[in-house]
């Protein structure tokens, strides 16, 4: 045991780095997404961006992201949310997206460090309304088994659909 007065790195700082590495490796595995994530940063509201890229690696669409880590999400074994994973979403990012501070589509990622599963929510206007979060610091979200990235190609396809839908709405 050290008697040093030097500040120490927290377990949380290492866990944050691990969660970002897990997410970056997954998203960039096909070279169709390029990530720009920050760790140990003090930027309010979001943790970075990722870009969908075309065959020439030109950016096609940028998404903003919030990345949260959890030691282990527990699957509900009883009640109305049986089979789902409860997570307490912090609402500051939700409010940031709802207030249209950015026009980029927004994704809320939750990385389960024990299983290395990456859960995600696309924060569409409909999703934000359904979450009913205003005036609250957190809101419980019930992740379904289908709301984690089990196949990166499916996630890329869904991200492309989000981009095309947003593009059509803007025109």
Label each region the model flagged.
Residues 1-44, 50-171:
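Mixed-charge (Asp/Glu-Lys/Arg
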